[in-house]
Regions:
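Short helix-capping and inter-helix turn/linker motifs at the boundaries of alpha-helical repeat units
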Residues: 9, 109, 172-176
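Short loop-to-helix capping motifs
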Residues: 35, 147-148, 191-192
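Short, charge-rich amphipathic alpha-helical segments embedded
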Residues: 152, 204-219
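Short amphipathic alpha-helical interaction/hinge segments
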Residues: 162-172, 208-215
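Conserved amphipathic alpha-helical segments that form helical-bundle/coiled-coil interaction surfaces
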Residues: 84, 96, 101-166, 177-186, ...
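Short linear motifs at protein or domain termini
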Residues: 1-101, 213-219
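Hydrophobic alpha-helical segments typical of transmembrane helices
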Residues: 18, 49, 80, 91, ...
Length: 219
């Protein structure tokens, strides 16, 4: 579901702050969201914008509102993980087959430098920063298509999946993930659309399997 189309207000600010804390697991799945505490933490004087933000996040399945019980961070579901990766496996390789010749040398160079840097400093990597880079990378692979609807769908999926990845890999980033990104860049640089699609599909499948294999109580 698309992010709410609302004006730049306190509710917008609260929405962005709380959403990032949920996505990057600062607020844990199942955690109670106390309206008063959230309002104080964000530094607002009124409950109203925070309440509006939580309703918007409920519409994105990030917050659960239970009458007479309260508000909670939505739980992680293994079915949601597999469903999201299935969508990615269907859409992303096909899209890259179209956009591959359109991805600029500057984009390739930028991400190659970033992933090579991560590869060299893997033990001290800031995993939160890596996930933001990874999300931007996959969004930039589809960006040349100039399809805003597709971009919104995939962005929502990336944000949902980031929660699972934070839960699974925040202690250590599997090296194979970095190597697969570099392999994707190699095929794009060669303008080999068919090979790029195959490599990306393999990467998505491997990422899904790695998440499931962690068995961190996501079901």
């Amino acid at each position: 579901m698309n992010a709410p189309n609302i004006k730049r207000t306190l509710a917008t600010d609260a929405y962005k702050i709380i959403k990032e804390k949920i996505i990057f697991c600062e607020y844990s799945p199942g955690q109670v969201l106390n309206l008063r505490a959230l309002t104080q933490e964000i530094g607002f004087k009124s409950f109203t914008p925070v309440r509006e933000a939580l309703v918007s996040l409920r519409d994105e399945d990030l917050v659960k509102i239970v009458p007479r019980q309260g508000m909670f961070v939505s739980e992680l579901s293994l079915n949601d993980v597999t469903d999201n990766y299935q969508i990615r496996e269907i859409i992303e390789p096909t899209t890259l087959g179209i956009t591959c010749p359109l991805i600029t040398k500057e984009t390739i160079r930028y991400y190659r430098e970033k992933f090579e840097e991560i590869r060299k400093t893997e033990d001290s990597i800031n995993y939160l920063e890596y996930l933001k880079l990874d999300m931007n990378f996959h969004m930039d692979l589809i960006r040349p298509l100039n399809n805003n609807n597709l971009g919104s769908i995939l962005k929502n999926i990336y944000e949902q999946n980031t929660r699972y990845r934070m839960a699974c890999f925040k202690k250590r980033l599997p090296e194979v993930m970095i190597l697969e990104h570099i392999e994707i860049l190699d095929t794009i640089e060669e303008k080999d659309s068919q090979r790029a699609s195959i490599v990306l599909k393999k990467h998505i499948i491997n990422s899904r399997n790695a998440l499931i294999s962690q068995k961190l109580g996501l079901n």
